[in-house]
Amino acid sequence: MGKINISESRDFFVRDGERFFYLADTCWSVFTNASFDEWEYYLEYRRMQGFNALQINILPQHDRSESSNYIDPFELTPTGDWDFGKLNEKYFDRAEKMVELAVKRDFVPALTILWCNYVKGTWGSKITPSKIIPIEYIESYVEYVVDRFGKYNPIFIVSGDTNFETNEAIEYYLTALEVVKRKAPYSLTTMHLMGGLWILPEVFIKSPNLDFYMYQSGHSKERQTLSFELAQKFYSLTVKRPIVNGEPCYEGHSHGGKYGRFNNFDVRKAIWQSLLSGAKAGTAYGAHGIWNWHVKGRKFLGEYIQGCLMTGELL
């Protein structure tokens, strides 16, 4: 399959001369959690359902579930911390094999490079402070992952759950965008934002390295109008780009940490509201238990995060 491009009208994608609708499933945690048997079963099932893209976090998802398949992405220091100057080839061999299996089934890998907990100056940096990647290692890390995965024609999602609250964080993401476009100029780029966010720093709006907008309408029961409100906000920006709701409410996810869970009707409603309000380039779907790759009897590592978000401890 050919590379994905932006349409001349700059509001949808094109591949092999035909319109390409981005229909992604969210499986952030597969590189650390899934066995290869599970992964191949999943790929066949999602292909049968009609999905054509997969959203994956390159580094370990902080709120994944526990797994016996976990491998650290960096070599360890004598104290057990990550050595950011030494990437773990075993981890990336496994990750690349999983991407290869997905691409053989015609999936587009949408790979997140820097989730906010790995970036200094973000709200997420308080979650795993020992795993913040120093800025001096960002260029070499991004060069490595682009070299590893670029041949599979991925979409690179440069950020994860970010809200650009500091100049430090902005520097990380600008550096990552520049490296991606320098190393893989034909790969599309976007940014996964914190739920409800639509105000991007002007430097990103004007950047030639950002190819399309992605927003998150999120998992708050009281704020489900964000599915169409954010689409309209992005559609009104001065620089026109395709728009995707990359994280509508997940099926089975709690109502923002409150009692009750989103069902399939809620998900369909959020997606249709997004598409009909300007986010017409595509959408993602997420199922609770799949994005964090949960196995019965294992611990949910995100329980602590939900509690802290509700109390404001991390914000």
Model-predicted segments: where are they?
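Active-site mouth of glycoside hydrolases
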Residues: 2-212, 216-224
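Short glycine/serine/threonine/alanine-rich loop segments
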Residues: 51, 107, 154, 241, ...
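Structured core elements
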Residues: 55, 72, 244-245, 283
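Generic recognition of flexible, low-complexity loop/linker segments
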Residues: 145, 201-202, 231-232, 270-271
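Solvent-exposed polar/charged
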Residues: 147, 182, 236-237, 276
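Active-site clefts of carbohydrate-active enzymes
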Residues: 162-163, 196, 210-218, 229-269, ...
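Aromatic- and carboxylate-lined catalytic core of secreted/periplasmic carbohydrate-active enzymes
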Residues: 251-253, 265-315
